[in-house]
Amino acid sequence: MKSLVLLLLVAVTVSSVVSKPLPEDSEAEVHKEFETWKVKYGKSYPSTEEEAKRKEMWLATRKKVMEHNTRAGNGLESYTMAVNHLADLTTEEVPKGLLPMPRPEEEEVDKEFEMWKTHNGKTYNSTEEEAKRKEIWLATRARVMEHNKRAENGSESFTMGINYFSDMTFEEIPKARLMVVFPTRDGGEEAEVDKEFETWKVQHGKNYGSTEEEAKRKGIWLATRTRVMEHNKRAETGSESFTMGMNHLSDKTTAEVTGRRLQDGEEAEVHKEFETWKVKYGKTYPSTVEEAKRKEIWLATRKMVMEHNKRAENGLESFTMGVNHFADLTAEEVPRGLFPME
């Protein structure tokens, strides 16, 4: 089948799909839109067969425009498109020189999508379904890339990746465990985690000035590791569309990572919140070093809860979270069975 042409006000994009009216529009509305377009551009055809053929090309162009503009609305494109007088023409019929050259970055992304499909065994029932899934995949990819850019710049303490669920909406991802049980570690497990920490230190050239400093940093590292593991467990069971990983910032606090200290007022408020929480749950610690370590874990828990609740406000989570008496414990320290399961 001949390629179909989308010619915009300032550019042309080629489509190889003959489209039906989009589901949200009635056939009568789309037909009226086509008739209005014909009048606007003085279009007439020698036969009903020719008009039917041209309308199919116009529909494909219209669909492409709407999909592009949806991406633009989501920040995935830097411009919007519109249908003009060449929207019912094939590539061969468009005047020479009006078709744009393919952008290398688009070809690379298309290749990446094809490789991802192959890797995850993805097939779709129609070109329309594939186009829809690709749009979701592109949105996930953009979100992951933006996060990883922040990680490169030191604004995040972990990296993300694409997985099998990256072409699904949040509602479509199988609802699995919202929280994960990590059993209490025995001696062997603890030794494995200690070995993992030592390997991470060597990999990232980490040295600490004292055993107290190392204990503090290990506490932060464990909190980051726990958050990453819980997220990736949800990704495995389908509750997240990407995976995370550790990096050289995993032993740092949020303030250290971002390079931004809390303002005096903010710091005082957070400190007051921590002190209030300690009183509420009867928390005391044997040393200032231990308290500093527990406060870092509490801060990481608080941050995770706040981020989750922000997503809940935006409709991306179906429940809200709160900080409780386990908020200064790592997942390994929380008694077995106390993490909620769906």
UniProtKB/Swiss-Prot annotation:
It is found in: Cytoplasm; Vacuole. Glycans are attached at N153, T184. The keyword Cytoplasm applies. N-glycosylated, with sialylated biantennary complex-type glycans. Keywords: Cytoplasm, Glycoprotein, Protease inhibitor, Signal, Thiol protease inhibitor, Vacuole. Gene3D superfamilies: 1.10.287.2250. It holds the Pfam family Inhibitor_I29. It comes from the Eukaryota. Its main location: cytoplasm. Residues 1-19 form the signal peptide. One of its GO terms (molecular function) is cysteine-type endopeptidase inhibitor activity. Expressed in the skin, liver. intestine, spleen, pancreas and kidney. GO terms for cellular component: cytoplasm; extracellular space; vacuole. SMART domains: Inhibitor_I29. Inhibits papain and ficin (cysteine proteinases) but not trypsin (a serine proteinase). This is Cystein proteinase inhibitor protein salarin. The lineage of its organism: Eukaryota, Metazoa, Chordata, Craniata, Vertebrata. The gene is salarin.
